[in-house]
Each structure stands twice: as structure tokens, then as C-alpha cells.
């Protein structure tokens, strides 16, 4: 059984990217996106990690909404395959659409909880939208379908399984570390340097950073590298250029890390 993965994006609609995967065995490391992501399970079962109370089993017809920056992963059961779809939407664009729909300020999708929905009509609407995005329909038709879907979304759809980080003071303390890691993607600063920025010991920083982000400083920076790699690949940069610019040892190293986070090779993603 061969798996198949395809991506859709259009420079005329930069606020959305979509993906379809069939009979996939690919597993993802815990990661995040800089978009609001909505995933749908089409076939097979998978395990979602990122919920406050531990892993959650997902079944066909389930939707999962994950706000930007939330660390999560969704993988098939051991030895099994699954099929799924994934939409990545710009959160600010979503809020603008909801404001148009309601005549009121839209919800802050960056602060929404992670939600799992079992609502079959919403899943069917999602599938119809994705069929349209991957079709040869005019971009105006695709944009209209997308606006209708987002406008119909209820921020209370589904069950909330994880809220946004609640410790604002902790977030403030590790923010300088996050800024440095994001600014210096081409290499990893020493842990002691990062700890000094936060006024903590190395051990304290690792614990605090994981509480604030869900990842260690090193893992978080790798996640940021992959997010930047996706942007650069969409711009048409070569794999070799991206690998070098983001501090990977070589192109092979870049491909391994990218696939572990994205569930697809850089070449598959760039097509």
C-alpha cells in the first residue's frame, strides 16, 4: 500500500495552505505552526498529543483545531495507516472574516483553546472546501468557499482539550530567550547564555521553557527553523540554500529533520 501526500497553495490566497495525505505511516515529532490549523481524520485512527489531560484517540470524521504556536502532534496507531487533511489559515485573516460575518470583532484565534469536534456536518463541509481548493475552480470560487467555511465556524465548536498558556509572568521571563532563538536560527546559543538572559539556572530555564512552550529551548528552535524553512521553500529557494541558511549540517540532515516535523520531505512540500 503506497501512501500519497499532496499540498495546495496559491500566491493569490496567501492566507491558506492545504494538505491531503492518504494511507500515511509518517509520524510527526511534537511541533507547532504559525497558523491556525484545522485537521480532519478521513480514515484510520490516530493519537493526538497536545491535550492537557494526555493523548486523545481520533477517529474518522473528527476535526481538530489548533491555534498558532501550540505544540502538538498527531500520529497513526503503531503499525497502522491513516488518511487525513490539514488546513493552515492565517489567524488574523480568520478574525477579519468572522468580523465581516458577525458585524462584531472576531474571536482572537491566537488565544483559543485546542478543540476536538465530532460534528459530522462540519466535517463534511470541511471536505467539500478542500475538494474545491484542490480543484481547477477559479480562485474567486475557492476564496468564497473558504470565507463561507470560516464564517460558519463557531469558536465553541467541539470540546476544548487544552487552553492557552496561563502563566503570563513565566511567558515574560522566557520571552527574551525565545527572541534570541528566533533571531539566531543559523546556530544554537549556549544554554548558559540563554539561562542568563532569563535570570535562571540552566535547569530552571529548561523546566520553565517547557512549561511555557511545551518544548525545550533546543527543540523549540528546531521547530522555528522548520517553520522558516517552509516559508523559504514556498518562495522557491533551493534545499541546499535553505539548509545552509538555517544551520543544518548538510542537505541530508535538513531533509531528515524536516520530514520528522512535517511528515513530508522538503521536496514533497515544495511541489
Model-derived segments and their meaning:
Residues 77, 97-101, 156, 232, ...:
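Residue-level signal for well-ordered alpha-helical positions
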